[in-house]
Regions:
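Structured, basic alpha/beta domains of bacterial-type, RNA-associated proteins
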Residues: 1-14, 21-25, 29-113
Length: 113
């Protein structure tokens, strides 16, 4: 049975829609290749994603003893986190809602044989 190595980051201050654009670049790649792609991706969400991938890689080495050269990104996804809401003043005495969306990032690695 294959073991899944997981890492998760919660309440990342980027919307899940924007994070998913970057996640699609690294899904299915080897971990070292994924970190290189994230390093040169000009998107603000690439920083937290690379930290989560590196954390999952460290979990695999420390807890299970798997070589980092054999790991690949099996699953990676972003879910919506709580949205911070506040009101701005609009025309005619109305309020306009401002939403600051955030996301949870989950990375699952597996060992490729």
């Amino acid at each position: 049975m294959e073991t899944d190595i997981k890492a998760r980051a919660k309440n990342i201050p980027y919307s899940a829609q924007k994070v998913r654009l970057v996640l699609d670049l690294v899904r299915g790649k080897y971990v070292q290749e994924a970190l290189t792609v994230l390093k040169f991706t000009p998107n603000a969400a690439a920083g937290p994603i690379s930290k989560v991938v590196a954390s999952a890689m460290a979990n695999a080495e420390e807890n299970i003893g798997v070589s980092r050269d054999d790991l690949y990104v099996y699953k990676i996804f972003a879910d919506e986190a709580p949205t911070r809401k506040w009101r701005r003043f609009g025309a005619r005495g109305r309020f306009k809602p401002w939403l600051r969306r955030s996301s949870h990032i989950t990375v699952v690695l597996r060992e490729r044989e």
